[in-house]
Amino acid sequence: MIRAIVFDLDNTLVDFMRMKDDAVRAAIEGMIDAGLNLPRETVRARIDAIYQERGLEFQQVFDVLLEREFGQVDPRILASGIIAYRRARASALTLYPHTQLALHELVRRGIRLGVVSDAPRMQVWLRLCELSLQHTFDAVVTFDDTRERKPGAAPFREVLSRLGVPATEALMVGDWAERDVVGGRSLGMKTAFARYGDTFETQESGADFDIDDIFELVGIADRINGATGSAAPPVGAPARPPAPAR
């Protein structure tokens, strides 16, 4: 039986990499317009290198860029980059197709929903609120809640505790096999690999299910729970049964 489904956030519910790319591109244009005298390709390479060092959630990337290049931070250039980044992020932060409908159908079936993310607490909640999902999930666990990243057991144990369900009655859904799938399976959760969000060209996910559309989770839950009268897949969603993991 499946009583709860736990989601990774980035590249599982939201297309994080597209959002990040659009926002960084906009920030570069904003800084150049404000007087940054560097080629776009050079600026992008420098920014990518800083993210590689500090992580994609690092919030002072433009400060570090300017300090390294010029030995000081020009507030006009910095502010222009930040504003352009925020505006582009807000417009580019979107859910994957059929996510709202899938979440609605799962809640309608009485399935509890959770989120486990390696991102900082405030960044997770900002994304959820921007997407109007702040009231959707029964439990949200971020890096700041356990100080341990997936596939470590602590974040999975924490979300299961908050949801009030045993691991054997929960399904973990994520795009990163080595973190989401491995971490969930290690505790005895069923697992689904969000192939639609995979950025690593994963061949063998090791998950119980591979899904190409998030709405497939509704069929998985119905099948495991023996439900009848399942909701029809939305237009554009795969009509076939969920694929076994490859």
Segments (PLM) and residue ranges:
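Asp-based, Mg2+/Mn2+-dependent phosphohydrolase catalytic module
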Residues: M1-I5, M17-R18, R68, Q100, ...
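N-terminal helical cap/lid subdomain that shapes the substrate entry/recognition surface
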Residues: I2-H104, R108, M122
